[in-house]
Amino acid sequence: MADGWIAAGVAAGDMCACAGRYDALVERCEERGMAACHDATEVVAASDIVVAAVKPYMIEKVFAPLKDALADKVVLSVAWTWDSAKWEQVLPGVAHISTVPNTPVSVDEGVIACEKASTLSDEQRATVLGLLGKLGTVVELDSSLLFVGGTVGGCAPAFVAMAIEALGDAAVKHGIPRADAYRIVSQMVLGTAKLQLATGQHPAAMKDAVCSPGGATIKGVVALEDAGMRSALVKAIDATLQ
C-alpha cells in the first residue's frame, strides 16, 4: 500500500512503519524515503492514520496496549477476518475501519473491499476513502460480505496470474518468445478488464462479440467449457472461503 500511495503522489516522508525485523525494515524504508520506527508505539505517536497490517492472531497482542494512545487516531485495518465488531472488542471507543486490499494496490490498480460499518466520523471516513481511492477502486460492502468481496478481489489475482502463465505457455508452445508471450497475455487481460469497466457490458456479451459462427474462438470456448473452467473458478473461491 505504501508503494501505491507513493506512486500516487503521497509524500513518502509522511509515512512511517515498524516491523519485527528492524534491520530489514530500515532498508525497505530507506529505499522509499519513509521513516523506520522501532515499535508500534513510535508509529502511533507519529501518525494520524495507523494501518493495521499484522497477522490476525497478533492483533490483540499488538493493539490492546495501544488503546489509550489511539484515542485521537484512525485505525485502518487490512487484517483478514477482522471486521468492525471484532475491532470494537479490542479497541472500544477508537475510530477504526476494516478493509481488504489486493496486491495491485502497489501500482494504483487495486480493488479495496471496505466495510460500510465503522466507528469513523463522516470527516474521517471521507479522508480514509480518499486515501484508499488513490490505490484503485473502493467497493463498500456490508459486514457479512466484506470477506467475500475481499476473497474475490484479494485471492483471485493468484488465479488470474495462473491463467496468464498458462496462456503464456500456450503462446510459447506455438513459437512466441516467453517475454513477448507474457506481454501479449497481460495486456490482453488489462484491455479486456478496462473494456468491461468502461462499457459495463456483460462478460457473456463480450465473449459472444469475439465468437464468429464456426470460428476459432468458439472452439476454444467449448474446450474451456469441456475442461470445467467456470466450475473450477467457482470452486476456487469456495475453497478460499472455507
PLM feature spans:
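NAD(P)+-binding Rossmann beta1-loop-alpha1 motif at the extreme N-terminus of oxidoreductases
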Residues: M1-H38, G110, V172-H174
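Short acidic capping loops at alpha-helix termini that bridge into adjacent secondary structure
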Residues: A12-M15, D39, D72-K73, A179-D180
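Small-residue helix-packing motif on alpha-helices
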Residues: M15, V43, P177-I184, M206, ...
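Short acidic-hydrophobic, aromatic-tinged amphipathic segments that line or gate anion-handling sites
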Residues: A35-A40, V139-L141
